[in-house]
């Protein structure tokens, strides 16, 4: 008869591994699962839903941080500030669509000069007339 006790030669109990580490994620799967359950989005929450949501959130965070890091490097800075996040999000078409209604605190505005306010390009026509005078 097979007993239910400890197996012969079994050492200490197996160390617990988090669902985040099982999925290879940095974002907390357990915490997201708790928020999904407490938020009453549905009566029941499947086992894969918090893992998938954590993966999506981690990907979005990595994408924004990479673009913000590039913006910081372009401005010769080593620290990402809200301005760099604003520039990163607004310069990316898909992130702008996703976060279009969001306001980033201390992000500033995108630099933009309307075309009618820019000076006319008269230099090109003068250069062509100067070439005619030389001949």
Curated annotation (Swiss-Prot):
Keyword Ligase recorded: no
PROSITE patterns in alphabetical order: HISTONE_H2A
Any GO molecular function: protein heterodimerization activity
Record's keyword terms, sorted: Chromosome, DNA-binding, Nucleosome core, Nucleus
Role, per record: Core component of nucleosome. Nucleosomes wrap and compact DNA into chromatin, limiting DNA accessibility to the cellular machineries which require DNA as a template. Histones thereby play a central role in transcription regulation, DNA repair, DNA replication and chromosomal stability. DNA accessibility is regulated via a complex set of post-translational modifications of histones, also called histone code, and nucleosome remodeling.
Assembly and interaction partners: The nucleosome is a histone octamer containing two molecules each of H2A, H2B, H3 and H4 assembled in one H3-H4 heterotetramer and two H2A-H2B heterodimers. The octamer wraps approximately 147 bp of DNA.
Protein name, per record: Probable histone H2A.7
């Amino acid at each position: 008869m097979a007993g239910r006790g400890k197996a012969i030669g079994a050492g200490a109990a197996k160390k617990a591994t988090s669902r985040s580490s099982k999925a290879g994620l940095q974002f907390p799967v357990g915490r997201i699962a708790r928020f999904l359950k407490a938020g009453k989005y549905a009566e029941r929450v499947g086992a894969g839903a918090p893992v998938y949501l954590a993966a999506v959130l981690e990907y979005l965070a990595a994408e924004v941080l990479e673009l913000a890091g590039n913006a910081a490097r372009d401005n010769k800075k080593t620290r990402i500030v809200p301005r760099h996040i604003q520039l990163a999000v607004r310069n990316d078409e898909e992130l702008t669509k996703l976060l279009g209604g969001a306001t980033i605190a201390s992000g500033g505005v995108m630099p933009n000069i309307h075309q009618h306010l820019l000076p006319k390009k008269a230099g090109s026509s003068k250069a062509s007339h100067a070439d005619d005078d030389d001949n």
